[in-house]
Amino acid sequence: MPRVFTGLPANYAAPTLALSLLLPLLLVVWTQLPVSARPSTGPDYLRRGWLRLLAEGEGCAPCRPEECAAPRGCLAGRVRDACGCCWECANLEGQLCDLDPSANFYGRCGEQLECRLDAGGDLSRGEVPEPLCVCRSQRPLCGSDGRTYAQICRLQEAARARLDANLTVVHPGPCESEPQILSQPHNIWNVTGQDVIFGCEVFAYPMASIEWRKDGLDIQLPGDDPHISVQFRGGPQKFEVTGWLQIQALRPSDEGTYRCLARNALGQAEASATLTVLTPEQLNATGFSQLQSRSLFPEEEEEAESEELGDYY
C-alpha cells in the first residue's frame, strides 16, 4: 500500500509553482512602469537594488559559473553574490551596505572598505544612523600620476576608472607640489560705501603662504590702510589654505586689479580679479543689465571648480 503524507494542507503548492505564477505578474508590472522608473543601463551596482527586489523569495539555483554575466564598471572591485556563485560589483565608499554579514540586500563593500554605522546624523532630530561603506585607511597617498589622493580607496577607484593609466601608489603621504589655486577670486563690481570680499583657495605640499596685492602698488595688502583687511585659515581640506581680502566702505580709488599670490618652496601660482567701483549716480545712469558682463563671471567659477576634479577630494 502506498504511503500517504497528511502533514501538508490540500492547497499546498511547491515554491517553484508559486514563482512561476509570480514572475509573469512582475513582468506585467515592469512593462507598465515609466521609463524613468526603470533601472538604468549604467554600472551593475546601480541596478542591483532592483534585481534584489525582483529576486526576493527566490532560492539559490545550482551554481553554473559559465552562465554568470560578467559585471562591468566595478570601481570598488567585485564580490560574490548572495548565493556565492556569480561575481557582482562591490559597493563604493559612501554607499549603503549590510552590517550583518549573513544579510545580502544592500550588498557588500569593496576592497579596502568596511561597513560601519554612520554617526554623522543628528540623533536628537530622530535621524537614524545608516550603515555605509567606509575606507579602512584615511591616510593620503601620492599616485603615479602626480596627484594626491585622500586614501587608498580613492586611488583604487581612479585606477579602475582609467585602466590605461596604470595608476599605482608612489609613496604614503601627499605628493610634493607647487601651489595650485583651486578657487580663484572673481571679478566683481559694487557701489561706493559698500563692502566686497575676494576669496582664494590653494592646495600645496609643503603648505603654501598666501598674500594679496593690488596692481600699481608695491606693498603687500593690507599695508596701513584701515579699511582693508586680510584673513587666512587652513582648509577646507587637508593641505589647503584659504585667504580672503575684504574692502570696507568702497571708494573710487579702490577700483583696480587684485591678485592672490601663493608660494611654497617648489614654486608659486597667482590669480587675479578686477574690482569695478560705481557711484550711485553712475549706477542709475548705466543700468544694471549693462553691468552684468562686469559682475561675477559664472563661466570662470565653473572652470575654477572643475580644474582639479579627481584630485585628492
From Swiss-Prot:
Q: Where is the IGFBP N-terminal domain?
A: 56-136
Q: Predominant location of this chain?
A: secreted
User: What is this protein's tissue specificity according to the annotation?
Assistant: Highly expressed in the spleen. Moderately expressed in the skin, lung and urinary bladder. Weakly expressed in the brain, tongue, esophagus, stomach, large intestine, liver and bone. Expressed in osteoblastic cells during bone regeneration. Expressed in secretory osteoblasts in the tooth.
Disulfide cysteine pairs (residue numbers): 60-83, 63-85, 68-86, 74-89, 97-115, 109-133, 142-175, 200-260
Q: What does this protein do?
A: Involved in the proliferation of osteoblasts during bone formation and bone regeneration. Promotes matrix assembly.
Name used for this protein in its record: Kazal-type serine protease inhibitor domain-containing protein 1
List the glycosylation sites. Answer: 166, 190, 284
Q: What induces it?
A: Up-regulated during the early phase of the bone regeneration. Up-regulated by BMP2 during osteoblast differentiation.
Matching SUPFAM superfamilies, A to Z? Growth factor receptor domain, Immunoglobulin, Kazal-type serine protease inhibitors
Record organism: Mus musculus
InterPro entries (alphabetical):
Growth_fac_rcpt_cys_sf, Ig-like_dom, Ig-like_dom_sf, Ig-like_fold, Ig_I-set, Ig_sub, Ig_sub2, IGFBP-like
Compartments, record wording:
Secreted, Extracellular space, Extracellular matrix
Q: Which UniProt keywords apply?
A: Developmental protein, Differentiation, Disulfide bond, Extracellular matrix, Glycoprotein, Immunoglobulin domain, Osteogenesis, Secreted, Signal
Q: Which gene encodes it?
A: Kazald1
SMART domains (UniProt xref)? IG (SM00409), IGc2 (SM00408), KAZAL (SM00280)
Is the keyword Signal in the record? yes
